[in-house]
């Protein structure tokens, strides 16, 4: 499976082993944290989803793994620990605003040991070019994702060509209330990634097609970045 391949590549690329300190921002149910802790790394996983963190904690307890899970919005996460490697996977970086990205990268810089690394993935401009502006209306839009009860859902997708940003605006209409969710996604070129990282004290070491170390392709819908603290 991709996660196994990816974790194996990380182990060899970053020399992950006993005593290595790793932080996984947006760790979810611990898919990476669990695998890296099995290599005797000391892992911290941060995620906003209580259900995911509970599942991850149960897995760690069952396998007696050294993982510290934190149920928190990672934008608010603080620690005195210093890490050799920081992960942010599943293109989470793209969902942050420019100010949030700057905050995150500055924190990553502070949280890392000297010459520590960041590995993250982002959506490419190819993926941006594939996105279309559209309007969609559906009863129980996204198969009931937004509410356990009945509702009507509207999705409006807007593209911002200059900024390379896409907005998915969801309007959910229930019997008792109506609310709106704004999902912003930033799409990147390698040059834009490099600009943001170098402004926060990082040097880009390599680009890959994904977080399993597949060679970089300019045709891909996403790409991965390894950056080193300067």
Task: Put a short name on every predicted segment.
Residues 2-18:
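Conserved alpha-helix/loop element of class I SAM-dependent methyltransferases that forms part
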Residues 102-114:
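A short glycine-rich, Lys/Arg-flanked "PGG" loop and its adjoining helix->strand segment in the class I
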Residues 190-230:
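C-terminal lobe and adjacent flexible extensions of AdoMet/dcAdoMet transferase-like proteins
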């Amino acid at each position: 499976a991709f996660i196994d391949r990816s974790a194996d590549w990380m182990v060899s690329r970053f020399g992950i082993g006993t005593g290595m300190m790793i932080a996984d921002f947006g760790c979810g149910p611990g898919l990476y944290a669990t695998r890296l802790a099995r290599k005797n790394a000391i892992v911290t996983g941060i995620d906003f989803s209580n259900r995911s963190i509970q599942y991850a904690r149960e897995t760690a307890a069952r396998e007696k793994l050294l993982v510290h899970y934190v149920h928190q919005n990672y934008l608010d996460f603080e620690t005195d620990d210093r890490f050799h490697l920081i992960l942010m996977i599943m293109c989470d970086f793209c969902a942050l605003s420019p100010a949030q990205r700057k905050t995150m990268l500055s924190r990553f810089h502070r949280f890392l040991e000297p010459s520590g690394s960041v590995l993250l993935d982002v959506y490419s401009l190819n993926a941006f070019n594939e996105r279309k502006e559209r309007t969609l209306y559906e009863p129980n839009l996204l198969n009931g994702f937004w509410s356990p009860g009945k509702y009507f859902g509207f999705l409006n997708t807007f593209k911002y060509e200059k900024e390379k940003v896409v907005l998915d605006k969801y309007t959910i209409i229930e019997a008792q209330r109506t609310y709106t969710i704004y999902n912003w996604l930033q799409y990147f070129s390698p040059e834009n990634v490099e600009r943001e990282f170098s402004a926060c004290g990082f040097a880009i070491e390599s680009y890959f097609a994904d977080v399993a170390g597949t060679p970089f392709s300019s045709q891909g819908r996403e790409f991965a970045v390894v950056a080193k603290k300067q």
